Amino acid sequence: MLGLIVALWATPVTWGAAAATSATFLAISIPLAIIAALMSKMMNIQTSTIPKLKCFDEHVELKLADGTKKTISQIDLGDILEDGATVVSKMRLNADNVQMYNLHGIIVSGTHVVKYQGKWIKMAVHPAATKVPYAKPYIYCLNTTSKRLMINGLTFTDWDEIYEGTLSDILSLEIKNERIGLDIKIEKEENIHKHLETGFSGNTPIELENGKTVCICDVNVGDKLKNGDEVYGLVDVDVLGMNQIYRRRLGDLQYIYGGINLCFGVDPDLTLVITAERYNGNVTKLYHLLTNSGKVCVKNVEFYDYNSGVDLFL
């Protein structure tokens, strides 16, 4: 709970949620940051290093609203699918050691959730799914405004994998903060992208283990980051439909640009003052990473990876 409170206070969109579990920002944010940093060091708290990939083979076809079809690897941000949902983010992921299944010609990972006889189940336990050998390097997934993927008459969850109880939790979120004029109610699936989407501008610097620094848009699957984490997935995010892009100041005249819901932990030396302001410049696409630790370091500040945008609210 302590780590969650710190993470929620660390980004503007989650201050309302943080208020539900803590008294006031000025009274507790700095003490909590110090305590969280000390506890992390003493207890060696880590997130899971075993990602659960919910993805499809590159040749799985999706029907668009205009009746044409595209393979999932060819889908573009902004494409409108047959159910009227818009594609708002796209993932390409490492397929190493992922068990894939064939369900009526759809090649999909065993951890992906599909609706069967009115219930949501993992692909691995679907009675008609069969294991298949798989040697391709990458698998793919999407997020959509409906939070569903309709493929050949079957209904799958999208990457966020929220349904039933978890979907209700997200749709019931109310986020208010008078300091920056936030008064948000999620209520509808399409508002998840609008208010909770996360990502960095393409020129955000990422330090690699080999000493090189590259823009986040040039990071590759399998790259090792400065802290030793491995990138197992790349995420492209459509800015269209998002609530706002923010500019964040990290320390002395260091700026990064991204969505309102960038979630970060405690600064390692507790010396950086991180501020955020609305940015009206030309940012048309965001990028994020998926790592085996669930974290990404930018300019010596540790952020949570793409999954945090929704997961921190569940």
Residue ranges and their predicted role:
Residues M1-I45:
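Small-residue-rich hydrophobic membrane-insertion segments
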Residues A19, A23, G67-S73, Y134, ...:
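Extracytoplasmic/periplasmic, Sec-exported soluble proteins
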Residues S29-L77, L154, I162-K224:
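Protein maturation boundaries and topogenic segments
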Residues D57-D66, L81-S172, K176, D183, ...:
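Long beta-strand-rich cores associated with HINT superfamily self-processing modules
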